[in-house]
Amino acid sequence: MKWLKRDCALQPVCPEGLALSFEVPDWNEIYDGCIELANQIKKSGFNPEIIVGVARGGWIPARILSDLLGNTYVASMKVEFYKDVAETAKKPVISQQVSTAVEGKRVLVVDDVADTGESLTTVRRNLLGRGASQVKIATLHYKPQSILRPDF
């Protein structure tokens, strides 16, 4: 998937003087990425019982994937890691636990990007610790420096 490159200096969220470039998908690219993910998930044979959207970037893709996979059971979970643009805390902290019981369930975790992979690793560990039978990760974008490679 090719996303548009944006200059952070032009964005209102960018701290003054920070030279940073990032990619921003449009709605069609997000939807097309979700179709690609749904096809990969179906082809793999993985059939999630619960889809967990990681707040906030994973909410929209999780909702779209729920339609594409025919799974209406969507939950949410929030992890705090970024303090500001390009500035992280020492470690991710789960600030909102998953909004449903996952014990014995196959769970698909959805986020927009696997950046460092720290947040997604924390989410996977937490869900397995809560008794999920299987946890798979799907992201629209994957950065090579991520410590976690998404399943989809």
Regions found by a protein language model. Give the residues of each.
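PRPP-associated nucleotide enzymes
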Residues: 1-152
